[in-house]
Every structure is written in C-alpha cells, then in structure tokens.
Curated annotation (Swiss-Prot):
Main location: nucleus
Function noted in UniProt: Component of the Mediator complex, a coactivator involved in the regulated transcription of nearly all RNA polymerase II-dependent genes. Mediator functions as a bridge to convey information from gene-specific regulatory proteins to the basal RNA polymerase II transcription machinery. Mediator is recruited to promoters by direct interactions with regulatory proteins and serves as a scaffold for the assembly of a functional preinitiation complex with RNA polymerase II and the general transcription factors.
Domain of life: Eukaryota
Organism listed in the record: Bos taurus (Bovine)
Family recorded in the similarity comment: Belongs to the Mediator complex subunit 31 family.
Entry protein name: Mediator of RNA polymerase II transcription subunit 31
Single GO molecular function: transcription coregulator activity
Disulfide bonds: none
PANTHER family, per the entry: MEDIATOR OF RNA POLYMERASE II TRANSCRIPTION SUBUNIT 31
Segments crossing the lipid bilayer: none
Length: 131
C-alpha cells in the first residue's frame, strides 16, 4: 500500500516537473524574456547555466514533439554559448532577435502557402491525367 502511494506521488511529481520544464523551455523562445533573465544576472549563475545544459534533452524527438514553439530549441542551443548570454543584456540584441523571428514567420508562412498551392495543383494535374 505504501509503495503504491509513493509510486503515485513520484508519477505526480514527474508529471509536474515535465510541465514546468516544458513551460520554461518554451519561454526561451521569447527574446524579451531572455533579456529579462540576462539583466537580472541569471546567466552569470553557474547553476542556472548548468540547468540550461540539462534542458538540452528537449531536443530529442520524444520530448520535442510536445513543444508549441520550436524556435525555443534554437535559443536553448544558443544559450549554451557564453558570448550569446552576455549579448542578451543589451535590449537592442533582444529586439533584433525578435525582429528576425517575425521576419522568419512572415516568410515561412508565405513560402509554405506557395508550396501547398503548388502541391495541390500538381495533385489536380495527376488526378486529371490519371482519369
């Protein structure tokens, strides 16, 4: 009985840890949040930097599939570099990253729509010639 209760407690704890780490990793996609962390000295704390290194397991497909903002993995990768962490103190750096993300999303959406339209046209042609 006690073992079952302990197991349930472990499962609940693991689930909570998973949710908290998922939420935190996704917050890393926000350049303004990264700037906030840098200005408050979190990136100078060796324990925090080690925690960021630990979080690299989110790059594994079994975990990455839960991410809503995949660009957070790129930011997590960049945060492994001290130079990048130091640059984030500068608000202009965060603003530049933010602008680059917006440009990427805009062009990605357009490219994706064009590719989808081309694929749909190709399928229509294949269906028409196959009949």
């Amino acid at each position: 009985m006690a073992a079952a209760v302990a197991m349930e407690t472990d499962d609940a704890g693991n689930r909570l840890r998973f949710q908290l780490e998922l939420e935190f990793v996704q917050c890393l996609a926000n350049p303004n949040y990264l700037n906030f962390l840098a200005q408050r000295g979190y990136f100078k704390d060796k324990a925090f930097v080690n925690y960021l290194k630990y979080l690299l397991y989110w790059k594994e497909p079994e975990y990455a599939k839960y991410l809503k903002y995949p660009q957070c993995l790129h930011m997590l990768e960049l945060l492994q570099y001290e130079h990048f962490r130091k640059e984030l103190v500068n608000a202009q750096c965060a603003k530049f990253i933010d602008e680059q993300q917006i440009l990427h999303w805009q062009h990605y959406s357009r490219k994706r729509m064009r590719l989808q339209q081309a694929l749909a046209e190709q399928q229509q042609q294949n269906n028409a010639s196959g009949k």
